[in-house]
Amino acid sequence: MADQPERNPNSQPVELNRTSLYLGLLLVFVVGLLFSSYFLN
């Protein structure tokens, strides 16, 4: 039943997971940099 909604569990989940991870890391880095700059200012 878990294979019905996802027909291609070979490219979609992997790509989505990778994109999500990279986006999350980038967001955290940007937020940290902005916060640091704001505090330093």
Swiss-Prot record:
TM region positions: 20-40
Pfam hit, one: PsbL
Membrane topology: Single-pass membrane protein
GO CC, alphabetical: photosystem II reaction center; plasma membrane-derived thylakoid membrane
Record's subcellular location: Cellular thylakoid membrane
Biological process, per Gene Ontology: photosynthesis
Keywords associated with the record: Membrane, Photosynthesis, Photosystem II, Reaction center, Thylakoid, Transmembrane, Transmembrane helix
Role noted for this protein: One of the components of the core complex of photosystem II (PSII). PSII is a light-driven water:plastoquinone oxidoreductase that uses light energy to abstract electrons from H(2)O, generating O(2) and a proton gradient subsequently used for ATP formation. It consists of a core antenna complex that captures photons, and an electron transfer chain that converts photonic excitation into a charge separation. This subunit is found at the monomer-monomer interface and is required for correct PSII assembly and/or dimerization.
Family (UniProt): Belongs to the PsbL family.
Subunit structure: PSII is composed of 1 copy each of membrane proteins PsbA, PsbB, PsbC, PsbD, PsbE, PsbF, PsbH, PsbI, PsbJ, PsbK, PsbL, PsbM, PsbT, PsbX, PsbY, PsbZ, Psb30/Ycf12, peripheral proteins PsbO, CyanoQ (PsbQ), PsbU, PsbV and a large number of cofactors. It forms dimeric complexes.
Protein name: Photosystem II reaction center protein L
Species in which this protein is naturally found: Synechococcus sp. (strain JA-2-3B'a(2-13)) (Cyanobacteria bacterium Yellowstone B-Prime)
